[in-house]
Amino acid sequence: MPKPIEWNEFDSGMGSKLDVSSSLNSSSSNMDRDRSESPKRHVNGSNSLKRGLHFDGEHTERDPHLGNGQKYTQQERRVYVGNLSYQVRWFELKEFMGQVGNVLNCEILNLPNGLSKGCAIIEYSTAEEARTAIKTLSNQKFMGRLVYIREDREQNARFGSSSVSPSASSNGKDSEPDRQLFVGNLPYNVRWQDLKDLFRQAGSVIRADIQMNQEGRSRGIGIVVMSSMKEAMHAIQMLHNTDFMGRTLEVRLDRFAHHKSKPYSTHGNGYTFPAEMQMTTSSTYLPMLGANTQVEDLVYHAYPHGPCSDCIYVGNLPWATSDRNLLDLFTDIGSVIRARIAYEPTGRSKGFGVVQFENENDAASSIEKLNGYRYGGRPLQLSYAHYATPLPAVPTVLSGLPSVAYTPPVMHIPTTNSPLTPQSFTNSFLGYLPISMPVANMPAIAPISVALPENNIEHSLEPS
């Protein structure tokens, strides 16, 4: 097996402008696929079922092998790539898959809410390159995950361009999400003008914003939109991990830029989750997602605005947010123990969740950085979690000490209806008297008299 290759970064040369393929109409395929069916779209007046799954980045390249009369790509030149990182971009994946051949199309499959499914379809220029990719790149480490690659099983698949944004197709410019950068660890006194001047070193800046809290103070994070994707990549390489006014900057692509334009709608009084949104989770992440009954109290008994702790309450979440989405959102902030979304008995999200960190510092940092952050078009409401009753503590076991069962003493008081005999009373009472020990020079103990008020019977108890 080839030596595993670790891919975490990409070349800035991938920022070149790409051609956009033309729209192609066809009937739907009934072949079995490992990904969900796409929604229906109206194309040229006909209601045909098209692949509504689109590029993460809303770009597609024209296949030079496709003539005007050929609507579908060739199956033997396509491969399916699974177990991808949810943060991977199409140009990063193309760079990785391009090691073994010329990549014509690279499509990351997304959910209706814009989140990645963790899988993609790649098309090479020849069938031999596709077979080489399966043999060479499968089980290789890419962005921290072992990807698996196999042949694409859909015969009449094609890379439609219906999902290409108008801005990308009409004027040839890169879509804004591919040009939007997240800037972290900014000094709190930095203004948006300072941020814009800083990024002008890498290219033309369209917009620069500093995110503020409810009191109007900087959160230490900002958003910068460059004029092109190439300049955005150049800004990352130039400014990431550099010192700016005494602080080391974090500069990366804004992974939630695509989510902000995705609407979350409800129908009637509840939200209906489509089948595509039932995301499966590997057992590796189950402990972090809190998939056990012991953490139910962590979520369903939580309220906002609690005292400082390692648990935070995340409110105003989009209805489609899953446990996995919540975990991915806070993983970069600190060490997450578990992240859970609260659900109604009907399966509908309650719109809030709880995230537990390893320490209070990570919880405080997450509130400072993400409170008010627009996620899925909604400003998040973060605060420490509050519990009406304390969470049950983890039981501790003292090693080396035997367990002793203690039974509290119970004395029966006689009544006139059920008199207690002197002998039975004596036996019951003496069972709880300490055993007398011989002590030198100890005076004799006088007899003990016990008076019963109801029948005035005295019982003399002689110590043993």
UniProtKB/Swiss-Prot annotation:
Question: Where is the region Disordered?
Answer: 1-74, 158-179
Listed GO biological process terms? nuclear mRNA surveillance; poly(A)+ mRNA export from nucleus
User: Is Repeat one of the keywords?
Assistant: yes
RRM domain location is 77-154, 179-256, 310-387
Q: Where in the cell is it found?
A: Cytoplasm; Nucleus
Matching InterPro entries, A to Z?
Nucleotide-bd_a/b_plait_sf, RBD_domain_sf, RRM_dom, RRT5_SRSF_SR
**Record's function text:** Binds to intron-containing transcripts and is involved in quality control for the export of spliced mRNAs from the nucleus. Binds to pre-mRNAs until splicing is completed or until faulty mRNAs are degraded.
* Name of the protein in its database record: Serine/arginine (SR)-type shuttling mRNA binding protein
